[in-house]
Structure formats: structure tokens, C-alpha cells
């Protein structure tokens, strides 16, 4: 297994990985608000990659036997002029996606992807890395906790 920067020849694998992640989210979404729209597979990867391009981001792939088996995407957080009113706004990266195909989870692939993204953010001079994790994704939360991440915000939801 090797970690490489995204190459277009792996686009179909990226689409498959993002669908796998969304399908997993659907199984744990107690609020039943997530969905896998018929256009998700064709559009989501393109939208994510465009966001990376616009925000000095990167996508790294874990590749084995010429197939992407995991990915991580991250961008540089863009602050606006009003953010500075109540926040110090240190240069920070944000992990926007992380998925390792089910068959090889817990084999170190996620850790290798995290290490590569953290290395990239450090290279750019980031002081912090943010990550949003779906509240019902306990496996994801546990993984990030093991990597030294801790909760900073809590977003609640209530059906009315």
C-alpha cells in the first residue's frame, strides 16, 4: 500500500469510496436526514475536488494493486473579515473526508492517510486541524480521539 496525491485515473475509485461512506452514514443516522441522492455518485466527488482546488486543499489516496482503498481530503479554512471579531483565526486545516474501505479498516491505512494530511497542513504553516465527525459515527469519533483530536463545538438538533 502506498499513499499518493490524487490522480484523475482514480476518480471512479474516489466516487465509490464516497458512496461507501455515505451508505455507512445512512445506516447510523438516527435522525434519518441523510440521503444518497441518485446524482450523488456522479456529482459529489467533483464538488469535493473543486472545493479542494479553491481552498488550497489536497486529496491523498491509499492505493493498493492500482486501486484506491482509502482517501482523505482536506482544505485550508478561509476566514472572512468578521470572523476576527470573536476568534483569533489561526491558520488551520480542515479534514473534510476520510474513508477507508470496509475490508481493510483497522489495518493502519487511516492512520497513514492522517499522517500524510497532517504533514501537508504543517508544511503550509497550519497551527490547528479541525474535523467534523457525524455525531452517530462512534467509530470515527474513537479514531480521531486516538489521533489526539478533542471536541471543541457541539451542534444540537431538535425536531419541531
What are the language-model segments listed below?
Residues 2-28:
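A short beta-loop-alpha structural element at the N-terminal edge
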Residues 23-48:
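Conserved GNAT-fold acetyl-CoA-binding loop/helix
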Residues 46-61, 94:
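A short helix-loop-beta-strand connector motif used in the catalytic cores of GNAT acetyltransferases and
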Residues 61, 67-76, 94, 99:
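Conserved beta-strand in the GNAT
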Residues 73-93:
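Conserved acyl-donor/pantetheine-binding loop and adjacent beta-alpha core of acyl/acetyltransferases
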Residues 104, 108-116:
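Conserved acetyl-CoA pyrophosphate-binding loop and the N-cap/start of the following alpha-helix
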Residues 121-132:
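Conserved GNAT acetyl-CoA-binding A-motif
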Residues 130-140, 157-160:
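Conserved beta-strand-loop-alpha-helix junction that forms the acyl-donor binding cleft
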Amino acid at each position: 500500500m502506498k499513499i499518493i496525491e490524487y490522480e484523475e485515473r482514480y476518480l471512479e475509485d474516489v466516487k465509490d469510496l464516497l458512496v461507501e461512506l455515505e451508505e455507512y452514514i445512512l445506516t447510523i443516522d438516527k435522525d434519518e436526514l441523510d440521503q444518497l441522492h441518485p446524482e450523488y455518485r456522479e456529482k459529489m466527488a467533483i464538488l469535493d475536488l473543486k472545493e479542494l482546488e479553491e481552498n488550497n486543499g489536497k486529496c491523498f489516496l491509499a492505493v493498493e494493486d492500482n486501486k484506491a482503498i482509502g482517501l482523505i481530503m482536506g482544505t485550508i479554512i478561509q476566514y472572512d473579515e468578521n470572523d476576527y471579531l470573536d476568534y483569533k483565526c489561526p491558520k488551520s486545516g480542515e479534514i473534510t473526508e476520510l474513508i477507508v474501505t470496509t475490508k481493510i479498516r483497522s489495518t493502519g491505512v487511516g492512520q497513514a492517510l492522517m499522517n500524510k494530511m497532517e504533514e501537508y497542513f504543517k508544511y503550509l504553516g497550519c497551527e490547528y486541524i479541525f474535523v467534523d465527525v457525524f455525531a452517530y459515527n462512534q467509530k470515527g469519533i474513537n479514531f480521531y480521539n486516538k489521533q489526539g483530536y478533542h471536541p471543541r463545538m457541539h451542534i444540537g438538533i431538535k425536531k419541531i
